[in-house]
Amino acid sequence: MKEFDLVKAKVDIENIQMGTEGVIVHIYEGHAAGEVEFFDENDDTIDVVTCKFEQLELINERR
């Protein structure tokens, strides 16, 4: 996974429900985790959450 890839939460993460979509906005050194901006069906930001990549499913890879 890379910055700006579109992802979906595979599990509930803090206040983010499983299935919620988001965009990776930062990747930490070591590439095991990153910051993801999650948004609702109106594309409004819900929250920015630190996630392990194992908690995320890649929807669309940025090229």
Name each region found by the language model.
Residues 2-62:
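Basic/aromatic-rich interaction segments and small domains that mediate binding to polyanionic partners
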